From Swiss-Prot:
<dbReference type="InterPro" id="IPR036522">
    <property type="entry name" value="MoaC_sf"/>
</dbReference>
<feature type="binding site">
    <location>
        <begin position="75"/>
        <end position="77"/>
    </location>
    <ligand>
        <name>substrate</name>
    </ligand>
</feature>
<comment type="pathway">
    <text>Cofactor biosynthesis; molybdopterin biosynthesis.</text>
</comment>
<dbReference type="InterPro" id="IPR002820">
    <property type="entry name" value="Mopterin_CF_biosynth-C_dom"/>
</dbReference>
<feature type="binding site">
    <location>
        <begin position="113"/>
        <end position="114"/>
    </location>
    <ligand>
        <name>substrate</name>
    </ligand>
</feature>
<protein>
    <recommendedName>
        <fullName>Cyclic pyranopterin monophosphate synthase</fullName>
        <ecNumber>4.6.1.17</ecNumber>
    </recommendedName>
</protein>
<dbReference type="InterPro" id="IPR047594">
    <property type="entry name" value="MoaC_bact/euk"/>
</dbReference>
<feature type="active site">
    <location>
        <position position="128"/>
    </location>
</feature>
<comment type="subunit">
    <text>Homohexamer; trimer of dimers.</text>
</comment>
<dbReference type="Pfam" id="PF01967">
    <property type="entry name" value="MoaC"/>
</dbReference>
<keyword id="KW-0501">Molybdenum cofactor biosynthesis</keyword>
<dbReference type="GO" id="GO:0006777">
    <property type="term" value="P:Mo-molybdopterin cofactor biosynthetic process"/>
</dbReference>
<dbReference type="InterPro" id="IPR023045">
    <property type="entry name" value="MoaC"/>
</dbReference>
<keyword id="KW-0456">Lyase</keyword>
<comment type="function">
    <text>Catalyzes the conversion of (8S)-3',8-cyclo-7,8-dihydroguanosine 5'-triphosphate to cyclic pyranopterin monophosphate (cPMP).</text>
</comment>
<dbReference type="InterPro" id="IPR050105">
    <property type="entry name" value="MoCo_biosynth_MoaA/MoaC"/>
</dbReference>
<comment type="similarity">
    <text>Belongs to the MoaC family.</text>
</comment>
Length: 158
């Protein structure tokens, strides 16, 4: 038996069969941040970015991305997502935007990939909406910070 669940005994890629797994409540939160100059962050906090409301647009993009994860990530199961929330917080200390995406479902497999996809697409949207003002922005620190439910149990890191 392979240690990698998406690789069979012959080394071929496969989609894991989750049909025999119990449906349980599952939740995952992923986080990252976009660093930028203070002047660029001011465009967000003052609502003067040329492309419009950066935080609202990034929030919607992240939600849409979570729902499309199985179309973007090979071998990722399509899931019935129960909820997606995105927190986008301007942080003058970075300076930049802190992003956290939480995804919930009840099903046989976890939602870590959906949370990671939501956070990363929200960050990409922030970059896209502000790139005319600053090309040196950086998307950093993408990681799962919390996961609950399923056979492997709970996980937490900050």
């Amino acid at each position: 038996m392979s240690r990698l669940t998406h690789i069979d005994e012959r080394g071929a890629a496969r989609m894991v069969d989750v049909s025999g797994k119990a449906e349980t409540a599952r939740e995952a939160t992923a986080a990252c941040h976009v660093t930028m100059r203070a002047e660029t962050l001011a465009l967000v906090t003052e609502g003067t970015a040329k492309k419009g409301d950066v935080l609202a647009t990034a929030r919607i993009a992240g939600i849409m991305a979570a729902k499309r994860t199985s179309e973007l990530i090979p071998l990722c199961h399509p899931l019935a997502i129960a909820g997606v929330t995105l927190e986008l917080e301007p942080d003058a200390a970075l300076p930049g935007i802190r992003i956290a995406a939480t995804v919930k479902t009840t099903g046989p497999t976890g939602v870590e990939m959906e949370a990671l996809t939501a956070a990363s697409v929200a960050a990409l949207t922030v970059y896209d909406m502000l790139k005319a003002a600053e090309r040196e922005m950086r998307i950093e620190g993408l990681r799962v910070i919390r996961k609950s439910g399923g056979k492997s149990g709970d996980f937490r890191q900050e």
